[in-house]
């Protein structure tokens, strides 16, 4: 489904991703963790070509992402992305935010787009907010709208780039609950997060990155109880003892 082979990424002279080899299968939940500046977000953003790779090969859903001739919009239709900041249009209602892309990009009729939007608002637990504006919602509610918006395009893959890091502690749980439910339903998910409880409970595999490299890959029970890499041990001791 997602295949990185010897992927490198530079910003000028700065080597952000170093020889990345990673395969993510359909229906798998992969959580990427590591210290700030380790390249986690860049890696995820390469999947839908928000960032371009400098060398190597990246194949997503049988499409060579680094091929200049591909229809990038076609690729992105199959990939939902949820960022740290919700990026909702402030002048549109929740419903309008969710129906915009399906109507414009997929040419779905308005009635059907609204029904789909309501279905996903129900799924994320806020159907009563359909006619509210983003400014009337809490951060957690806005992030759940952003997830519903991503799902309304019926993607094959969902990418989450630190989806809870801008939220108040009391609203983090409601967003993680939605993500847990998605994982249970078999959505292919790539998640960058500092929420170790979520990673332990939901991930099929943990990918630990540091300084642009993947240092360790393991199932969560193995990674959290017995990490092999010294750098991973230090990271976990710092993050789990706070």
Swiss-Prot record:
Domain of life: Bacteria
SMART domains documented for this protein: AAA (SM00382)
List of residues binding ATP: 34-41
This protein's record includes keyword Membrane: yes
Main location: membrane
GO CC entries: plasma membrane
Keywords, in A-Z order: Amino-acid transport, ATP-binding, Cell membrane, Membrane, Nucleotide-binding, Transport
Physiological role: Part of the binding-protein-dependent transport system for glutamine. Probably responsible for energy coupling to the transport system.
Protein family according to the UniProt entry: Belongs to the ABC transporter superfamily.
Name of this protein: Glutamine transport ATP-binding protein GlnQ
Species whose genome carries this gene: Geobacillus stearothermophilus
Biological classification of the source: Bacteria, Bacillati, Bacillota, Bacilli, Bacillales
């Amino acid at each position: 489904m997602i295949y990185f082979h010897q992927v490198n990424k530079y910003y000028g002279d700065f080597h952000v991703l170093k020889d990345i080899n990673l395969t993510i299968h359909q229906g798998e939940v992969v959580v990427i963790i590591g210290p700030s500046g380790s390249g986690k977000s860049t890696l995820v953003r390469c999947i839908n070509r928000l960032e371009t790779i400098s060398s190597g090969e990246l194949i997503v859903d049988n499409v060579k992402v680094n091929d200049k001739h591909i229809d990038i919009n076609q690729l992105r239709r199959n990939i939902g992305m949820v960022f740290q900041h919700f990026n909702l249009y402030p002048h549109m209602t929740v419903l309008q935010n969710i129906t915009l892309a399906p109507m414009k990009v997929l040419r779905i009729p308005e009635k059907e787009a609204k029904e789909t939007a309501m279905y996903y608002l129900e799924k994320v637990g806020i159907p009563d907010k359909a006619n509210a504006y983003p400014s009337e919602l809490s951060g957690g509610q806005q992030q759940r709208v952003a997830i519903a918006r991503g799902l309304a395009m019926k993607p094959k893959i969902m990418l989450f780039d630190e989806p809870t890091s801008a939220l108040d502690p009391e609203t983090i749980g409601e967003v993680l609950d939605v993500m847990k439910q998605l994982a249970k339903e078999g959505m292919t998910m790539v998640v960058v997060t500092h929420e170790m409880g979520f990673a332990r409970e939901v991930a099929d595999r943990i990918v630990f990155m540091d300084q642009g490299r993947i240092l360790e890959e393991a199932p969560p029970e193995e990674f959290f109880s017995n990490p092999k890499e010294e750098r991973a041990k230090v990271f976990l001791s710092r993050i789990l003892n706070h």
